Amino acid sequence: MSEYKQCIVTRDDLKLSKGKFAVQVAHAALSAAEWASKGDLEKWKEGGQKKIVLKVPSIKELYELKEKARREGLPTALIQDAGLTEIPPGTVTVLGIGPAKEELIDKITKDLKLV
């Protein structure tokens, strides 16, 4: 039986406070899950809602990763900040991928580093 997980990919070039970082990750987790198939979402929930937080150097790599995920048919959510506190409005902060089968997500995230 396949394992299911979700990855949240953050931009290492943005220096966010811990609170802002946590909120952006939460936005991505919820938003990406809304795009998952009902079956994948249920299997992910049953398996404990595994999440992994990874990082990329900049927005360029974040967009490239989103495109790879799209080509694989994975649910994604690219999060833009409202700009009310630390960063300018519209700043793209994180990318949520999944939940989906672990092997599908690993195919495109295997070379990324943990936060």
Swiss-Prot record:
The reaction(s) this protein catalyses: an N-acyl-L-alpha-aminoacyl-tRNA + H2O = an N-acyl-L-amino acid + a tRNA + H(+)
Record's keyword annotation contains S-adenosyl-L-methionine: no
Keywords: Cytoplasm, Hydrolase
Enzyme class: hydrolase
Biological processes annotated in GO: translation
Pfam families: PTH2 (PF01981)
EC number: 3.1.1.29
Localization of this protein: Cytoplasm
Cellular component GO terms held in the UniProt record: cytosol
Signal peptide: none
GO molecular function, one term: peptidyl-tRNA hydrolase activity
Sequence similarity: Belongs to the PTH2 family.
General function of this protein: The natural substrate for this enzyme may be peptidyl-tRNAs which drop off the ribosome during protein synthesis.
Record-linked NCBIfam families: arch_pth2 (TIGR00283), PRK04322.1 (NF003314)
HAMAP family recorded: Pept_tRNA_hydro_arch (MF_00628)
Protein name as catalogued: Peptidyl-tRNA hydrolase
Organism listed in the record: Methanosarcina mazei (strain ATCC BAA-159 / DSM 3647 / Goe1 / Go1 / JCM 11833 / OCM 88)
